[in-house]
Amino acid sequence: MDIIDTALPDVKLLKPQVFTDGRGFFMETFRDGWFKENIADRTFVQENHSNSSKGVLRGLHYQTENTQGKLVRVVVGEVFDVAVDMREGSPTFGKWAGATLSAQNRYQLWIPEGFAHGFCVLGDAAEVVYKCTDYYNPETEQVLIWNDPAIGIGWPLQTAPLLSPKDLAGKTWAQAEKSALRFPDKKCRPNVSDGIFSDRLPTRLQYALCKEKHPGNEERQAQPRSGGIPVLQIQRERRIRAAVGHREGNNKRHNYTNQAFTDNQACREKRTDTVGVFQTAFAVFRLLANDVFQHRRQHRACHDGHIDGRRQINAHTDRKDGQGKFTA
């Protein structure tokens, strides 16, 4: 993908590489490793899909807590997509950037955490799909009015937009509650080498680490759950725990494999021993059977010889006359 800068340095326009032929087209819309390396180290947890008719304007929406980063693209129609920086302390605080997203140009807009987001439909209808880095929280959702002159968004509208009751009741810039995500000034922002800031976009934990540099904002700044441990140290410990867990899992699998091999080997040895016992018993049985068979055959031969001798004697006796002579 190609990365295109916008009026806000943290808001990026992404142009995908599209392959077309007579059958249609193919493109890769998202690759996690590339996005984390080139745009922001974020994990998306929710994806939304909206359909809007002609003249609809949605926004400007943001959450003061559980701030959401959004990766927006259009799958049907065309919209003008807008982001407004709501981070106090940011060099672009209160400024906006916009881009035209359509199913034809297939652009995507990355809007980091701490920005308000909205869009208006430019054609007959539009379908918008966007990924979020945090879950939707209606309790902390805020609406910034779409036409506040203090911001001065240049919506490309021909007629008055169609708005929801919630968007109609949006607050002006002066009334709106700003994002809980703070952008610290350069004087209090520690060096990356100090192991405190791990990314270009600070987190609430990082703001809490330098809260003494932001007087008056203590009630909005969450206490670090880790007790003020630097972010890089936390990430390093998480990686170590993950590596240890992975190594332990491999060891368990290795042990299971060894145990299975040992059990299989023992089973084979046991089976071999059993076969040997049966073979020995069968050989002994054959020897005994042969001895018995030979003994019975010899006994039969003796018995037959004895019977033949008796028959011959009886035959001679029957052929003798009274004087002891044989008769014809």
UniProtKB/Swiss-Prot annotation:
Catalyzed reaction equations: dTDP-4-dehydro-6-deoxy-alpha-D-glucose = dTDP-4-dehydro-beta-L-rhamnose
Pathways per UniProt: Carbohydrate biosynthesis; dTDP-L-rhamnose biosynthesis; Bacterial outer membrane biogenesis; LPS O-antigen biosynthesis
Residues noted as binding substrate in the record, renumbered to the chain: R23, E28, Q46, E47, N48, R58, K70, H117, E141, K166
Record has Cytoplasm as a keyword: no
List of catalytic residues: H61 (proton acceptor), Y130 (proton donor)
Claim: Protein biosynthesis is one of the keywords in the record: no
Site, as annotated: Participates in a stacking interaction with the thymidine ring of dTDP-4-oxo-6-deoxyglucose: Y136
A GO molecular-function annotation: dTDP-4-dehydrorhamnose 3,5-epimerase activity
Entries under InterPro entries matching the protein: RmlC-like (IPR000888), RmlC-like_jellyroll (IPR014710), RmlC_Cupin_sf (IPR011051)
Entry EC no(s): 5.1.3.13
GO cellular component assignments: cytosol
Function text: Catalyzes the epimerization of the C3' and C5'positions of dTDP-6-deoxy-D-xylo-4-hexulose, forming dTDP-6-deoxy-L-lyxo-4-hexulose.
Protein name: dTDP-4-dehydrorhamnose 3,5-epimerase
Organism for this UniProt entry: Neisseria gonorrhoeae
